[in-house]
Structure formats: structure tokens, C-alpha cells
Amino acid sequence: MSSKKRSASSRRWLQEHFNDKYVIEAQKKKLRSRAWFKLDEIDNTDKIFKRGMFVLDLGAAPGGWSQYVVNKVGLKGKVIALDLLPMDSILGVEFLQGDFREKSILKRLLNCIGDKKIDVVISDMAPNMTGISSVDIPKSMHLAELAFDISRDILIPGGSFLVKVFQGEGFEQYLREMRSLFKKVKVRKPDASRIRSREVYIVATGLK
């Protein structure tokens, strides 16, 4: 992609972003990001979170999802958030910065979890997007697979997994794998997800 095309694309994205009703509403409500509204819509439909739950938030920064979940699980619940990027603290959320593919970070994460299993894993992880589908989609699928792999190891029986995926090559196979391990699997496209984006959210409940 030429620099001129990238520049035009960037300008269009910025214009859309600042005119976006969810961005405006997020600023009014002092929310970390517009992603809060995506999770709110999904949770209103699928009833994922309950008081007292133990939740792991992957790809958490800047904290929109953690901000939503910590209010849902309450004081008796627990939220662990993890991201490569730094994240400002949120009351009730334990944040780890790093890549869980690294042994040292994975060890810290498992120490935070302790003997208790996780009720829900949520992942809004996304790669640095290039705008080239043949590059972006395999990268996003790789992140979704990593989230899926760790979920299988740490979720309680009957636990839930919510993950962002970009539709394209590998998507149907990923869905089949999810359906083999969870009792119920749904694909959601919340209103706050931009129409042009290939992103969807897979809600998997009832780990077998």
C-alpha cells in the first residue's frame, strides 16, 4: 500500500473515530474505550458475567472490558487483566504487562490465578493492523488460537470463553474446534463494531 493511500485511509479512520457515537458516549461516561459498549451488548444478550466470578481479560489495554467486568463481578469476584501495552490501574483489577507466550509472564499469570480455576476468559486481542487482509487475518487467528489454548487449561468445567476473531481463512475451522469443546457457541456482531470491520465475537459457553 502506498504512503498516499495509507495517509488517506488514516485520515478517514480518524474522521470516523471522532464522529463515532460510541466514542463520544464513552468520553461522556468516562469509559476507557468504545469497546465497553461491545461487551455490554454481548453480555446483555448472552448473560456471561455474574457476581463473584473469576475473569481473565486478555488484550485488556486500555481497559474498557476490565472496567465493565469489574462492576459485574463485584467485590467478591476477581479480574486479572493482561496486555503487552501498559494500562492505567482500575480498582479491583489486577494487571500484568507482558506476553503470556513468555515463560516468565505465564508463570506470573498462573501465580495470580493460584489454585482456583477461571470462570470466564475474554480476549479482545488484535494484531497491529496493516489493512492487508492476507496479512491481518492470519495474525488475528493466531492470537485467537493462543487465547483458545490457554482457556482450555485454566477454565472451570462449564466455563465460558469470549474472543474477537476476524472473519476469513481459518474462521470456520476455528468455530468447529470451539464447538467440539463447548456446549454452546454463538457468533455476535455488536452494533458498536464498525460495519466495515471483519471483526466478530465468538461466545462459547459450557466448557465440556
Swiss-Prot record:
CDD domains: AdoMet_MTases. InterPro entries: RNA_methyltr_RlmE, RNA_MeTrfase_FtsJ_dom, rRNA-MeTfrase_E, SAM-dependent_MTases_sf. S-adenosyl-L-methionine binds at residues 63, 65, 83, 99, 124. Pfam families: FtsJ. The active site is at 164 (proton acceptor). It comes from the Bacteria. Signal peptide: none annotated. One of its GO terms (cellular component) is cytoplasm. Keywords: Cytoplasm, Methyltransferase, rRNA processing, S-adenosyl-L-methionine, Transferase. The keyword rRNA processing applies. The keyword Transferase applies. GO terms for molecular function: rRNA (uridine-2'-O-)-methyltransferase activity. It catalyses: uridine(2552) in 23S rRNA + S-adenosyl-L-methionine = 2'-O-methyluridine(2552) in 23S rRNA + S-adenosyl-L-homocysteine + H(+). It is found in: Cytoplasm. Its EC number is 2.1.1.166. Specifically methylates the uridine in position 2552 of 23S rRNA at the 2'-O position of the ribose in the fully assembled 50S ribosomal subunit. Belongs to the class I-like SAM-binding methyltransferase superfamily. RNA methyltransferase RlmE family. NCBIfam families: PRK11188.1. This is Ribosomal RNA large subunit methyltransferase E. It comes from Hamiltonella defensa subsp. Acyrthosiphon pisum (strain 5AT). The lineage of its organism: Bacteria, Pseudomonadati, Pseudomonadota, Gammaproteobacteria, Enterobacterales.
